[in-house]
Amino acid sequence: MKTIAIAGLEKPVTNLIQGSDFFTHEVYDKVCSVLDNYLEIGGNTIDTAFIYRGGQSEETIGRWMKERNNRDKVVILTKGAHHNADGPRVNPEAIAADLEISLARLQSSYTDLYALHRDDTNIPVSVIMNALNEHIQAGRILAIGASNWTHQRLQEANDYAAANGLVGFSFSSPNLSLAKPNEPRWAGCVSADVLDCAWHEQTQLPLLSWSSQAGGFFTGNFAPDKLDNAEMVRVYYSVANWERLRRAAELAEQKGVSTIQISLAYVLNQKFPTAALIGAQNQVELESCVEGSQIQLTENEVHWLENI
C-alpha cells in the first residue's frame, strides 16, 4: 500500500485510512476482523474521534491494540473539540478534556495524529495553537491537524506558529470527493473546492479526506429518480454530479475497474499528498479499496472527471 509522510511522525501513513465510526462493543468481533484484515493487507492508520459512538469507537480500538500488543505498529488519528448542544467547543479546556478521555479510551499515552474536529472562527488561532503545542511538548500528541477548517484559517494558524516558534498543522482533513456537495453534509463541515486544492498544491500540506467516496454515490445504488435517501438527495444530487458519475463509469469501463474505484483513484491522484478515509466493513470492500488505490490517473483524466 502506498504511503505519505506527515511532519512530526516517524512512521509513514498509508494512503488508505480505516474508518471506525461503526465500531461498538456489540460488534467487537467484527471490529477485530476489520482491523486485522486492514493491517494484513498493508494498512497502518486508523481514524477515530471523541464523539464516535459515544466513545465506543476509541474504546474498541484501544482494546484491540492491547490484545494484539501492536500500539507501536499503528498510526492513530483521533479528533476532538467537536461542538455539542451548547455550541462550539474549540477552546483549550475542551481540547484538554477530550484528549485526556480519548487517550484513556485508547489505552495509550499518546496519539500519533490529533485533529480538531471543527473550527470556531471566534477563537484566535494563537489561543488554539498555543494549547495544541502544550500537548505536543507533553508527548500526548505527535502531529496536529484540523478537520473541516478552511484553507485561510489553516494558513493563518501556520503563519502564527511559524512566527512564534511553534509546531504548525501538518495535515488537513476536509471532505474531498469526485462528487461535489450541494451543501455541507453536516453542520460545520468543509469540502475542499478548487481554491482549497490549489492551496494544498502550493503548500503540499497532506490532505486526509473523509467521505472520500461520497457516501457511496458511485456504487450504482443511486439514480436521479431514486429519492428515498433524503440526505444523499440533499447533498449530492445535481446535474453536474450525475455527469461525473457517467464519466467515472465510462473511464472505469476503459480501465477494467469499477466506478467506485475510479472515484477513490480521483482522490488519490491529486497534485498534493492525499489519503482517503475508507469505511470498509469486510474483506471484499477492503480489497476493492486497495485495488482502487493502485489505479493511476493522468492529470487530463482527473481534470475531465471533475470539470463539468
Q: Where are the language model's segments positioned?
A:
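Short amphipathic alpha-helices and their capping/turn segments at secondary-structure boundaries
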Residues: M1-L9, E59-N69, D98-A104, N158-A162, ...
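N-terminal binding-site loop/beta-alpha segment at the start of enzyme catalytic domains
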Residues: M1-V74, Q137
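Hydrophobic faces of well-ordered beta-strands that scaffold small-molecule active sites
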Residues: T14-Q18, I46-T48, I76-T78, T111-L116, ...
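Active-site mouth loops of central-metabolism enzymes
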Residues: G19-D29, G80-A94, H117, N122
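Short, acidic/polar
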Residues: E26-Y38, V90-L106, Q155-D159
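Residues at alpha-helix caps and immediate loop-helix transition turns in enzyme cores, especially N-
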Residues: V27-V31, S57-T60, N91, P124-I128, ...
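Active-site groove signature of glycoside hydrolases
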Residues: L103-P124
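Beta/alpha (TIM)-barrel catalytic core signal, keyed to glycine-rich beta->alpha loops juxtaposed to Asp/Glu
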Residues: V125-N307
